Amino acid sequence: VGMDQKDAYVGDEAQSKRGVLTLKYPIEHGIVTNWDDMEKIWHHTFYNELRVAPEEHPVLLTEAPLNPKANKERMTQIMFETFNVPAMYVNIQAVLSLYASGRTTGCVLDSGDGVSHTVPIYEGYALPHAINRLDLAGRDLTDNLMKVLTERGYSFTTTAEREIVRDIKEKLTYVALDFDQEMKTAAESSQLEKSYELPDGNVIVIGNERFRCPEVRFQPSFIGMESSGIHDCTFKTIMKCDVDIRKDLYGNIVLSGGTTMFPGIGERMTKELTALAPSTMKIKVVAPPERKYSVWIGGSILASLSTFQQMWISKAEYDESGPSIVHRKCF
């Protein structure tokens, strides 16, 4: 082992050396499962990417809906004790996405790499009893596409090759408005086919895989999951809410996260929800162009509000009360 090798690589650097590394993800289904690795990522973020001293800046962290209490405390503890931040706050990702879209009431479908949630939010507060969690997100779609391509005779097996498939997914797939009709079209002509050049120069052609891959979100049975599709999860979430606010939720369905970036997803959601909801209900699905980063954008909006400044948990408050203060100040 040469002197120039580190014991761990994070982020883009790990991606660029992925051929000789084993890639690990400290977050599973939106919940942190490996705190040592998570700390490495935070350290890398502060010192190598942002190049800031964490002890000089308040930190706003985001969390998955229904994040376990112990996790919230651990997050708080690491920020204050390891990174010595002067102040911090924790907020739910979906709520921040809604702020980014300029709303305080609506139903957010937030879907990232490991987990999807449908979260109803009224006047800035998430309604926990009605949140639906679906353990079907970006990574599952990538895995499914790997499998489908393997059936076609292309072999993708290593963690490095998974990243190639993820790139294919991000560049070429889309959601069909009518899946069966699209399958017919794909069978009858080659107009839906697209080619992709692999890093070694080989070219692969993908056809109906382009829309079969994200269709799993609407029909999880495709990969043997018994859960409801994202349209059904959204409908169930709204139905668990008070009848008086349903109209506001139906009229403000906001998509957020990288796994809502598929072209056609907004139109398909509108179509599916129109079929489920009362016929007189006005349904509006909003897919903001910046939705891949809307959680971050919402966080930057929140943290810059003058009214938010008294919400921070300060180092002094933490020293006095310990990690459990996070439940009293962030809800």
From Swiss-Prot:
EC identifiers of the protein: 3.6.4.-
Major localization class: cytoplasm
This protein's record includes keyword Cell membrane: no
Entry superkingdom: Eukaryota
Keywords, comma-separated and alphabetical: ATP-binding, Cytoplasm, Cytoskeleton, Hydrolase, Nucleotide-binding
Catalytic activity: ATP + H2O = ADP + phosphate + H(+)
PANTHER family: ACTIN
Top enzyme class: hydrolase
Similarity remark: Belongs to the actin family.
Protein name, UniProt field: Actin
Cellular component GO terms held in the UniProt record: cytoplasm; cytoskeleton
MF-aspect GO terms: ATP binding; hydrolase activity
Described purpose of this protein according to its UniProt entry: Actins are highly conserved proteins that are involved in various types of cell motility and are ubiquitously expressed in all eukaryotic cells. Essential component of cell cytoskeleton; plays an important role in cytoplasmic streaming, cell shape determination, cell division, organelle movement and extension growth.
SUPFAM superfamilies in alphabetical order: Actin-like ATPase domain
Cross-referenced CDD domains: ASKHA_NBD_actin
InterPro entries attached to this UniProt entry: Actin, Actin/actin-like_CS, Actin_CS, ATPase_NBD
Compartments where located: Cytoplasm, Cytoskeleton
